[in-house]
Amino acid sequence: MRSFRSSILLVLLSLITVLNATRARSETESKVHIVYLGEKKHHDPEFVTESHHQMLASLLGSKKDADDSMVYSYRHGFSGFAAKLTKSQAKKIADLPEVVHVIPDGFHELATTRTWEYLGLSSANPKNLLNDTNMGDQVIIGVIDTGVWPESESFNDNGVGPIPRKWKGGCESGENFRSTDCNRKLIGAKYFINGFLAENKGFNTTESRDYISARDFDGHGTHVASIAGGSFVPNVSYKGLAGGTLRGGAPRARIAMYKACWFHEELKGVTCSDSDIMKAIDEAIHDGVDVLSISLVGQIPLNSETDIRDEFATGLFHAVAKGIVVVCAGGNDGPAAQTVVNIAPWILTVAATTLDRSFPTPITLGNNKVILGQATYTGPELGLTSLVYPENARNNNETFSGVCESLNLNPNYTMAMKVVLCFTASRTNAAISRAASFVKAAGGLGLIISRNPVYTLSPCNDDFPCVAVDYELGTDILSYIRSTRSPVVKIQRSRTLSGQPVGTKVVNFSSRGPNSMSPAILKPDIAAPGVRILAATSPNDTLNVGGFAMLSGTSMATPVISGVIALLKALHPEWSPAAFRSAIVTTAWRTDPFGEQIFAEGSSRKVSDPFDYGGGIVNPEKAAEPGLIYDMGPQDYILYLCSAGYNDSSISQLVGQITVCSNPKPSVLDVNLPSITIPNLKDEVTLTRTVTNVGLVDSVYKVSVEPPLGVRVVVTPETLVFNSKTISVSFTVRVSTTHKINTGYYFGSLTWTDSVHNVVIPLSVRTQILQNYYDEN
C-alpha cells in the first residue's frame, strides 16, 4: 500500500511539475499581439512608425529587440502595430495611457453569367446604371483575399482607360509575380504574410504550394475579384452549363488585390491572420481604394470582444471614416438564428440568395415517369440501367437501409453496373461525396441522393451521374423500386434553366440574424446572388474548368454588392458610405424580380424576413435614385459606441476627437440606420430618424406603415416637405405593443413615398413583458 501511495505521489508531483513548466512556458512564449493606438496623431507615416518602434524599444530594452519583435506598423489609416510579445509584455504595454487595447492575433476564414441580367444590369440596355456610369470606370475596388491570377481573361484591360490619378498604390513583385503583371484593370497587388509566419513557425516558405506573392494559389481571391469588377469575357460556360458572356458588376472598375490569406497544407485549407488583414486595410486606405470587398469571416460573435475590441471591425471603422465603403460577407453558418458575422454598424453585411437559374437533370424511371433532379452532370447520357436501393445495411446490430453514409457497411450488396438510390439528413457535401466515391469504387454507374431540399450545393464531381432530389421525390422513386421486379432508370445530362418558373430563395447556408451582440442593429443588411456563381479562378483550383469555376457562399454574394456599390460610387462620388448602404437597403426587392415571394431555406421553408435578407435583394437601378437616404457620420457611430457602454477615452482615441458620452447613455435605437429593430419592447418607446433628400429639390413625402403583428406604430410628422433650404428632416416613431406575453420577432415596414420613390425600411419588433428572461421552451 505504501508503495502504491508513493507511486501516486510521484505521479502527482510529476504532473504538477509539467503544469508549472507549461504555465511558465506560456508566460515566456512570444505570440503576435495587436497593439491598437486609435486615430493616428501625425500625418507623416515614417514618424508614426518611428513612434511605434520607440514605444516597443522602451518596453523591450533595445532598438534591436524592438526591430526583431515588430511584425507590422499600422501608419496610414490608423495608428498601431503588431509585435511578438509575451503575456507579461503585452500586459505592460496595455497599461500605457496612449494604448487603447492589446489583444492576441486572431484568424479569419474564407467565407458570373446570369447574375447581372437577373439584377437588371444587362449590358445590352443603353439606358441603365451600368452604362450611365461608364461601367464603373475610375472607381477602385480593393479586395482582401487569397490573391489574384493576373493572366485570367477577367482582368484584361481592353478598352480600359488610364489608371486613375488618385491611385497611390503599386504592384509588388514576388514569387511568380512581376510588377508588370498588373495593368490598367488590375492596378495594384500586395501581399502580407508576416503575421501568418509568426503564428506558424513550422511553415516552410520554400516548400509551400502557395506562392509567396500576390499570386493566387487557392482561386478564391481571383473568383471574388472577377465577380466585383471583372472585364467582359465572351463564350464562357461550365462544361456547357450557365453559358454566356462573363463579366463583373462594374466591368471597367479597377481592381487592387491585397493578399492576406494563405494556404497551409497542415491546416488543410486557407487561413488569414488578423494582423495581416489589418495591414492590408491600412495599405488599402493609403492607396486610395473606393470600395473594400472582404469575403472573410471570423467566429460568430458570442462574447463581448466585439467592435472596439475587434481589430477587424476597428480597422474597417477607419476605412469608413476615410470615405471607403466596406462590404463584408455575413457568413455561411445558416440557417440557425444569430449566426451572422461582421455585425458592426459601419460594415455593409451581405446575405446570399439563389439565382433564378437551376440545372435540372432528367431522371426517367422504367414506368416513364420523369423526375427533374438537380446536378451539374455534364457527362454522356446514362441509358436504361438497373436501379437499386440498398436494404438492411447493418452496423452494431443497427439497420441503416438506404442511408447514404452507410453504403460501405454492406460490401456484399452488389452495386456494380447499377444506379443507387440513398437518403441522407446530412447538411455536408463531404458525406455525400464519400457515398459517391464508394458507389464508383463498387462499380456503380450513378447515384440518386434524396436529401433535405435546403441543401442546394452540388455534392459530386461533374463527370459522375450524381443527382439530388428532395425527400418527396426520393420516396416516389423508392416506391417505384419496391413495386417493380426489375426497376431501371435513365439519367440525362444537366441543362440550364433561367427565369420563370425558377424561384429565388435565401439559401440555407447564409447566416441569419438577429445580431447576436447588438440586436438593435439589423444584420444582415442586404442580400445578393451567391449560389453557383460562375467566375474566374486559379488553375490550381480543383473545380477549375478552363480558368473558371462555379462556387457558392456569402463570399460570392459580397462582391456582387461591391460591384453594385462601384457603379453607384461612379454616379454619386460625393455620397458617404452610409448613404450607399441606405440607398440599396431602402430600394431592395422584397419579392423576386418576377413579383413572387422570396422564401428562406431552413429546417422548413418559410417566407423571408429581415433577419434572412436585411432590406431584401439588391435592386441596382432603384438604388441609383433612392429619393431619400438615412445618412450617418461620426456622431452616429459615437452614439452607437456610447450606447454599447464603451468608455470616453477609448471612443476618443478611436474617432480622433474628444468624446464625452451623455449620462444617462443614449439609446442605440436612435442610431440613424435604414431599419428599426426593437429587441425588448415592454410598453412603449419613441425613437428618431433623419432623412436627407437626394432627389428633386422640391419634394413632398408621405408616410405609410405596415406594422408588425400586435404592434402600434405612430410616425410624426406624417408628411415631410423638402425644398432648397430644407434638405434634411427628422421624424419620430412611437412604437407600442398590445401583446401581454413575451413574443418572438414580428416584422413590418415603414415607407416614405412621393409617388415616384418608395423609401422602405424594415421594422422588427419583439415584445418582452418580462425583461431579461431566457425562455428555454
From Swiss-Prot:
Other remarks on this protein: Plants over-expressing SBT3.3 show enhanced disease resistance and enhanced activation of MPK3, MPK4, MPK6, MPK11 and OXI1.
Residues in Inhibitor I9 domain copies: 32-109
Protein name (database record): Subtilisin-like protease SBT3.3
InterPro entries: Peptidase_S8/S53_dom, Peptidase_S8/S53_dom_sf, Peptidase_S8_His-AS, Peptidase_S8_Ser-AS, Peptidase_S8_subtilisin-rel, Peptidases_S8_3, S8pro/Inhibitor_I9, S8pro/Inhibitor_I9_sf
Family (UniProt): Belongs to the peptidase S8 family.
Species for this entry: Arabidopsis thaliana
Induction trigger: By hydrogen peroxide and infection with the bacterial pathogen Pseudomonas syringae pv. tomato strain DC3000.
Gene behind this protein: SBT3.3
Matches recorded under PROSITE patterns: SUBTILASE (PS51892), SUBTILASE_HIS (PS00137), SUBTILASE_SER (PS00138)
Recorded superkingdom: Eukaryota
Signal peptide residue numbers: 1-24
Record-level GO cellular component terms: extracellular matrix; extracellular region; plant-type cell wall
Stretches assigned to the Peptidase S8 domain: 115-624
A biological process from GO: induced systemic resistance
